[in-house]
Amino acid sequence: MAIPKIASYPLPVSLPTNKVDWRIDASRAVLLIHDMQEYFVHYFDSQAEPIPSLIKHIQQLKAHAKQAGIPVVYTAQPANQDPAERALLSDFWGPGLSEETAIIAPLAPESGDVQLTKWRYSAFKKSPLLDWLRETGRDQLIITGVYAHIGILSTALDAFMFDIQPFVIGDGVADFSLSDHEFSLRYISGRTGAVKSTQQACLEIAAQHSKLTGLSLRTMQHDVAAALNLSVDEVDVQENLLFLGLDSIRAIQLLEKWKAQGADISFAQLMEHVTLQQWWQTIQANLHQPCSA
């Protein structure tokens, strides 16, 4: 009834051919780190493949996502679930977690990351994920984590049903076995989403801001903090900057600085939505640079 101990296997090198030609768009995407909790990861040998490579690949993706202003969302199941709440899951997997609920240390959430409680296979079920995606105007989901043929596949299916493009990272997920892993990727690539390697995903993300010289959401946050004589921690990327004291003169000064670094954004666009997150999304959307795989 419990999750079986998982034998070591290598992450697949050859990925299935996608039926769709979707590309990751940093202004539309969210990175999901799915169920990378100590409880689930401990069924693997953490010193043997696929875990070392899986962790490295998710770290690489997260670094690229942060640089490009892509939000990062974590899911995690709670401990000591009420049997009535857990319901049919208990028939397949027993009572669930009693401890080890934390995300593994190498992938621990950082300030600004979103953390959601997860109750079912799909990250969408009984969670605010769908509402949050719609509120933030995001309609792409980059999916990493465990287990590919259970939560990853279910989440990709639900994303597709909700008109959110799922991108499953073929070497950024792990499963009970190589055969389960490969089955999941074949199904997703042919029926419900796009499968990318970590390298492909990072290239597509990086291509969209390669025109920018040293400009990122983080550097813009520092620039705004300096202009308003605030600490960086006081500048929330989703807060209306007018409430923090931004005026048109300082907005123009910031605009000129960012244009010199390659940003394509007008003063009218700057003042239409006065948050750093929305400014960065506009800059990303205006790049119009073809993606490369």
Swiss-Prot record:
Gene3D superfamilies: ACP-like, Isochorismatase-like. PROSITE patterns: CARRIER. The modification O-(pantetheine 4'-phosphoryl)serine is found at S248. Binds 1 phosphopantetheine covalently. InterPro entries: ACP-like_sf, Isochorismatase, Isochorismatase-like_dom, Isochorismatase-like_hydrls, Isochorismatase-like_sf, PP-bd_ACP. Residues 211-287 form the Carrier domain. GO terms for biological process: vibriobactin biosynthetic process. Its EC number is 3.3.2.1. It catalyses: isochorismate + H2O = (2S,3S)-2,3-dihydroxy-2,3-dihydrobenzoate + pyruvate. One of its GO terms (molecular function) is isochorismatase activity. It is an enzyme of class 3 (hydrolase). Disulfide bonds: none annotated. Keywords: Hydrolase, Phosphopantetheine, Phosphoprotein. Pathway: Siderophore biosynthesis; vibriobactin biosynthesis. Its cofactor is pantetheine 4'-phosphate. Belongs to the isochorismatase family. Involved in the biosynthesis of the catechol siderophore vibriobactin. Vibriobactin is a chelating compound involved in transporting iron from the bacterial environment into the cell cytoplasm. This is Vibriobactin-specific isochorismatase. It comes from Vibrio cholerae serotype O1 (strain ATCC 39315 / El Tor Inaba N16961).
